[in-house]
Amino acid sequence: MATLSFRNVKKTYAGNVPVIHGIDMDVADGEFIVIVGPSGCGKSTLMRMVAGLETVTEGEILIDDKVVNTLEPAERDIAMVFQNYALYPHMSVFDNMAYGLKIRRLPKDEIRKRVEAAAQILELGKLLDRRPRALSGGQRQRVAMGRAIVREPKVFLFDEPLSNLDAKLRVAMRLEILKLHRRLNTTSLYVTHDQVEAMTLAHRMVVMYQGVPEQIGTPMEVFEKPASTFVAGFIGSPPMNLLEVAVGGDGIVHTSDGIALDISPLAVPQQVRGRKVVMGLRPEHMLLNAQGLAAEIEMVETLGSEQLVHGRCGKHMVVVRCSTRQFSETPARVGDTLTIGPDGRHPLHWFEADTGRRVEGL
């Protein structure tokens, strides 16, 4: 196990194209960090710099307080699990898991001991003689994880390891990875674009956007107190409703196209009064037929126990997440107009109109 640190790490490609704009972060011994963000945000580039597959343009990466910028990948004592498994098709499961240890010239008895121990952890004991073509997608991914485990590295790197699996297998493998980390407690860096993976796996998550860490925090910190409109719109399904509003000195709120919101001034903090800001409301923290604003229903998504009600209020689209029972008690249908508003139990979110950052102190 080890600590992992980033000191003003930057990456620029040829032509002076910046990809990573400067990251400072400390990962504690045994911590599971998930880097999440949309395609092109720099998350995989950051992972590859830790692995030694990309050079660091500026700054330092440290493993156990030792700068590793100039070390070869094999010298960093890390193990990486890829999206596409990267198994040798002509080798058995045992040989795939043992290959890296053979390259390092470990004794045969030690190799067998490590492979069998990893196989027991991952429930691969009966599959050691099979070739990859005889395995399911989930089994292949477990073999890839087993190959990483036997190295007994200081740091695990996971590069979107579940992206090739179907929805059911992804759930199962998330649980496998959780159990694996609790058992081994190895420092881990995990890259994904899937917010569900980030929320369920991470001790802390790093939300990346355009090469910049928008927010670093525990999953619930990021969900309950997003640092920017980007984070608010990226974390949460459906994402947070964001309305451009003008707030009067008396706490009365109007949308940017002049529609009044029937919201108690008591819910409007002093920091945003007399200003133009962005107001955020989580879909699950809103109610149908509640004080707020009138919206025309444009679409209803049925998810079994829940309904997603999409409504238009002027130029803004708003989504309400409600139970099927609550929706069945509401006579409104597509094309009808009804009032929707905050449930009063959860605070509203407020962001700066120009920067998108959360209003300070809220």
Curated annotation (Swiss-Prot):
Domain of life the protein comes from: Bacteria
Cellular component GO terms held in the UniProt record: ATP-binding cassette (ABC) transporter complex, substrate-binding subunit-containing
Reaction equation(s) it catalyzes: sn-glycerol 3-phosphate(out) + ATP + H2O = sn-glycerol 3-phosphate(in) + ADP + phosphate + H(+)
Record: residues binding ATP: 37-44
Cellular localization per UniProt: Cell inner membrane
ABC transporter domain location: 4-235
InterPro entries in the cross-refs: AAA+_ATPase, ABC_transporter-like_ATP-bd, ABC_transporter-like_CS, ABC_transpr_MalK-like, ABC_transpr_MalK/UgpC-like, Mo/tungstate-bd_C_term_dom, NA-bd_OB-fold, OB_MalK-like
Keyword vocabulary terms for this entry: ATP-binding, Cell inner membrane, Cell membrane, Membrane, Nucleotide-binding, Sugar transport, Translocase, Transport
Entry membrane topology: Peripheral membrane protein
PROSITE patterns assigned to the protein according to its UniProt record, in alphabetical order: ABC_TRANSPORTER_1 (PS00211), ABC_TRANSPORTER_2 (PS50893), UGPC (PS51315)
Enzyme Commission number: 7.6.2.10
GO BP term (any one): glycerophosphodiester transmembrane transport
Main localization (coarse): membrane
GO molecular function terms noted in the UniProt entry: ABC-type glycerol-3-phosphate transporter activity; ATP binding; ATP hydrolysis activity
Family note: Belongs to the ABC transporter superfamily. sn-glycerol-3-phosphate importer (TC 3.A.1.1.3) family.
PANTHER family (alphabetical): MALTODEXTRIN IMPORT ATP-BINDING PROTEIN MSMX, SN-GLYCEROL-3-PHOSPHATE IMPORT ATP-BINDING PROTEIN UGPC
Oligomer and partners: The complex is composed of two ATP-binding proteins (UgpC), two transmembrane proteins (UgpA and UgpE) and a solute-binding protein (UgpB).
Main function: Part of the ABC transporter complex UgpBAEC involved in sn-glycerol-3-phosphate (G3P) import. Responsible for energy coupling to the transport system.
Protein's recorded name: sn-glycerol-3-phosphate import ATP-binding protein UgpC
Native source species: Bordetella pertussis (strain Tohama I / ATCC BAA-589 / NCTC 13251)
